[in-house]
Amino acid sequence: MELQKLLSYTRKAVDEYRMIEEGDHIAVGISGGKDSLTMLYALHGLKRFYPKKFELSAITVDLGFEDFDLSPIQALCQELNIPYRIESSDIYEILFHVRKESNPCSLCAKMRKGALNQAIKEMGCNKIAYAHHKDDIIETMLLSLIFEGRFYSFSPKTYLDRTDLTVIRPMMFVDEKDVIGFKNKYQLPVVKSKCPVDGYTKR
């Protein structure tokens, strides 16, 4: 996928759901995977010509896995002139050594979001961008129907009153195959997950 096509899909979502307002400071949550890195490029490109001026920062919550090297992402953010924060945590130690969780995904997500939101507030951001694409939204809806008997999926924009942050999902119109194509074309520096249960649990 070309950058121009990615920007078109991103702007469509941003405009339709009024995701960005003048003066916003948006934190881009970076996991190291293809989705979040593609979104970083998309918002960086959008920032250059979008009529409403906004600031971008990037952040990764380091869960504490050994050999989780974030230097390629640091280099990318430096190249794009985007401030980048690595928020260290003991989440891995707590989940796998203290609590010895056999299915840690739900608790991990809650702890990670807690650490992320606190750090984002410290950074002075008022919004956080998540890289959920169209396939994620459809998959979440199907899993909700199968396991909970109801239709539920991510909202394009959600205000979190407890933290006074707004979550936006500017990649909601982008297909995963296009994300893969963009990652390959632009050789994004994907950092592989070190989680021992990655790929072995349902969403």
Name these PLM-found stretches.
Residues 102, 168-169, 196:
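Residues at structural and domain junctions
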Residues 136-137, 160, 198-199:
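Short gly/pro/ser/thr-enriched loop/turn and capping motifs at secondary-structure boundaries
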Residues 153-178:
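Short, flexible loop segments at boundaries between secondary-structure elements
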Residues 1-141, 147-150, 155-156, 177-185:
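ATP-dependent adenylation/nucleotidyltransferase module used to activate substrates
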